[in-house]
A protein has these predicted regions:
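Phosphate/pyrophosphate-binding active-site loops
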Residues: 1-116
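Short alpha-helical segments that sit at the start of domains
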Residues: 116-147
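Short acidic, hydrophobic short linear motifs in intrinsically disordered regions
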Residues: 151-165
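Short, cationic-aromatic polyanion-contact patches
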Residues: 158, 188-206
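Short coil turns linking two alpha-helices in DNA-binding domains
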Residues: 169-170
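Short, hydrophobic-biased segments on the C-terminal half of alpha helices
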Residues: 177-178
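Glycine-centered, phosphate/nucleic-acid-interacting loop/turn motifs that mediate DNA/RNA or nucleotide
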Residues: 184
Length: 206
């Protein structure tokens, strides 16, 4: 047997033998180990990311997770390759890799939590305003604000942005916004007049 086959056998033993060691750290080690072995001509990175997700599912004792480590790594490709190069070049210390991996898991979990919060808030908002008679333009703008989340729509919504988004006149935009304000769908922010902007009435989504 060649070196790769021997290493793969050790690798499979590592990921399959039950242990009380920290599952998140084991997921980090498994990912790095597979990348270093590099058993395939192509696709080693994708397989390593899939292995990470599998190991994290085991660590959390759940077949379903609300975040994807594969996606999180794809979103941080530059730092991912930087830390891999640092860890696999002239050192046997993998502490920096484990720290990066665990921080990326934490970031993925936080982002998933924020996404869930947005989805829940959006559902609650529309449930609360289910009986409001809103035109397609108003629904489009409200969905854009809801999808952006709290403070996510820079500068808030105003008549100019509304008119541009809905391809309508400023007069129509102002009338629609005033109607949304009267119906409690949005709240005003700013000093008033031309500087007035609007955001979703987030209190109604709690």
């Amino acid at each position: 047997r060649n070196i790769v086959e021997d290493e793969m056998q050790r690798f499979f033993d590592f990921i399959n033998i039950p242990t009380n060691e920290n599952g998140y750290v084991r997921a980090a080690i498994a990912h790095l180990w597979f990348v270093i072995i590099h058993p395939m001509d192509d696709g080693n990175g994708r397989i390593a990311r899939a292995l990470s997700d599998m190991m994290l599912s085991r660590a959390e004792n759940s077949p379903i997770r609300l975040y994807s480590m594969s996606s999180a790594i794809n979103d941080s490709k530059r730092s991912y390759y930087d830390i891999l190069e640092l860890t696999t070049t002239g050192t046997i210390d993998i502490s920096a890799w484990i720290e990066w991996f665990l921080q990326t898991v934490l970031t993925a979990q936080k982002n998933a939590h924020l996404t869930i919060e947005k989805v829940v808030a959006k559902a609650r908002f529309w449930q609360l305003h289910i009986h409001n008679d809103l035109n397609p333009r108003q629904k489009k703008v409200l969905n854009r604000l809801l999808d952006a989340g709290k403070e996510g729509f820079e500068g808030g919504m105003n008549a100019r942005k509304y008119a541009s988004l809905c391809d309508c006149s400023r007069v129509t935009a102002s009338r629609d916004l005033s109607d949304l304000l009267d119906k409690g769908c949005i709240k005003s922010r700013g000093a008033g007049g031309r500087s007035t902007s609007y955001d979703v009435e987030w209190e109604s989504t709690k």
